[in-house]
Amino acid sequence: MLFPTSAQESSRGLPDANDLCLGLQSLSLTGWDRPWSTQDSDSSAQSSTHSVLSMLHNPLGNVLGKPPLSFLPLDPLGSDLVDKFPAPSVRGSRLDTRPILDSRSSSPSDSDTSGFSSGSDHLSDLISSLRISPPLPFLSLTGGGPRDPLKMGVGSRMDQEQAALAAVTPSPTSASKRWPGASVWPSWDLLEAPKDPFSIEREARLHRQAAAVNEATCTWSGQLPPRNYKNPIYSCKVFLGGVPWDITEAGLVNTFRVFGSLSVEWPGKDGKHPRCPPKGYVYLVFELEKSVRSLLQACSHDPLSPDGLSEYYFKMSSRRMRCKEVQVIPWVLADSNFVRSPSQRLNPSRTVFVGALHGMLNAEALAAILNDLFGGVVYAGIDTDKHKYPIGSGRVTFNNQRSYLKAVTAAFVEIKTTKFTKKVQIDPYLEDSLCHICSSQPGPFFCRDQVCFKYFCRSCWHWRHSMEGLRHHSPLMRNQKNRDSS
């Protein structure tokens, strides 16, 4: 019997240490099966003078004379308990503990941890409500020790009360569902920070690869316009496709240094595969343009191609492949731009960005394809890197708004030629612009949907696209490579 009944209380007073020991042993708790006298003779003598009320305000370890536990001080033991439990009444020199034991907290009455009840089950109910996993956070300053069941019980009850409060607190989303007829201001969603602060950037990056997962809305098939070059000037960078799988950078340099000094660029190369080309192709960057000419002269090619595009092949070997033909794709600088009407003024607002271009597609061919599909093409340009080699994207300008919108609406076009088949992606060409909503912040995000078709800053994007029916819009951003390209 842990607590005496009311009849016994008047004659015996508060329980002594032996009664508490028997009660705690009946709970089958670890560490309570030993007599208290084995801890310390001095501390056991002092512990018998403590009352049950002092145990509620102090850790059990202090009552037993044990070193203090290394828990963080919990404020609810001081202030929260005073608010939740009525203050004990003073009767002479004794404190009556029955009001505390009979009191209830403000948590639901059906809860197992809603407070203490009268009788000998008080501490047993409290112990049974403890949550062992996950434990309450604490700082161990002395290397660990026994946990305070009273503090853990109060912390468990506080967690349930906070969860109950969160369950009844209406959120903006639940408010809009509860009253569907009410007009909810779009800035409701702005009160909650997005889970990922770069979610717009992530969506914009994903959109750049949209051609790989979307179906083409229209198809162009035919023969590319012929190419006639007179003393062409090449980029110092060439594409090398179909290289041996076991080739190394040193092997490439040894093979091609006979044409001049060069370096090797391996797209996708990382520390896991430092020896082999991860994608089966590399780029060779020569110091001089004449080195590219010498390489092309050493290649086998077919100059009688119907479209005038010669395919160059070079034979090389590796450690495990004695002879392998690799394809060499150079780039003529004149293929980077095509102007149909030199006197026509180019309007950036009627310019589209074309991505996922094939390496054999030059500016003139791109202009011819989009002019056949949409009409009104006056300019086409291929984006290049610092070596003036294509990076797989381009720009096309129209002379009328109708053709421009038709191209933007098409979005994905499949190009079929005798040499290759490629699906390209068409988006509005983006410039540096202020936000079209607030006109005070830069607008790096563009919405290509015809309902919006504006530049947005981050805040205005979240505000605008929090409205129902606009959340599916995909953002566009300028690619950093396009900023550095010429």
Swiss-Prot record:
Positions of region (Disordered): 87-120
Main location: cytoplasm
Region (Necessary for stress granule assembly and correct localization in dcp1 bodies): 255-486
Organism: Pongo abelii (Sumatran orangutan)
InterPro entries: CEBP1_N, CEBP_ZZ, CEBP_ZZ_sf, CPEB, CPEB1_RRM1, Nucleotide-bd_a/b_plait_sf, RBD_domain_sf, RRM_dom
Any single Pfam family the record assigns to this protein: CEBP_ZZ
Family label: Belongs to the RRM CPEB family.
Domain called RRM: residue spans: 236-328, 350-431
Gene that encodes it: CPEB1
Post-translational modification: Phosphorylated on serine/threonine residues by AURKA within positions 91 and 122. Phosphorylation and dephosphorylation on Thr-97 regulates cytoplasmic polyadenylation and translation of CPE-containing mRNAs. Phosphorylation on Thr-97 by AURKA and CAMK2A activates CPEB1. Phosphorylation on Thr-97 may be promoted by APLP1. Phosphorylation increases binding to RNA.
SUPFAM superfamilies in the record: RNA-binding domain, RBD
Gene Ontology molecular function: any one: mRNA regulatory element binding translation repressor activity
Protein name per Swiss-Prot or TrEMBL: Cytoplasmic polyadenylation element-binding protein 1
Record text about domains: The 2 RRM domains and the C-terminal region mediate interaction with CPE-containing RNA. The interdomain linker (411-429) acts as a hinge to fix the relative orientation of the 2 RRMs. The ZZ domain (509-566) coordinates 2 Zn ions and is probably implicated in mediating interactions with other proteins in addition to increasing the affinity of the RRMs for the CPEs. A continuous hydrophobic interface is formed between the 2 RRM.
Entry-annotated residues carrying Phosphothreonine: T97
Keyword annotations of the record: Activator, Cell projection, Cytoplasm, Membrane, Metal-binding, mRNA processing, Phosphoprotein, Repeat, Repressor, Ribonucleoprotein, RNA-binding, Synapse, Translation regulation, Zinc
Any one annotated GO CC term: nucleus
Positions bound to Zn(2+) 2: C447, C452, H465, H473
Cellular compartments annotated: Cytoplasm, P-body; Cytoplasmic granule; Synapse; Membrane
Origin superkingdom: Eukaryota
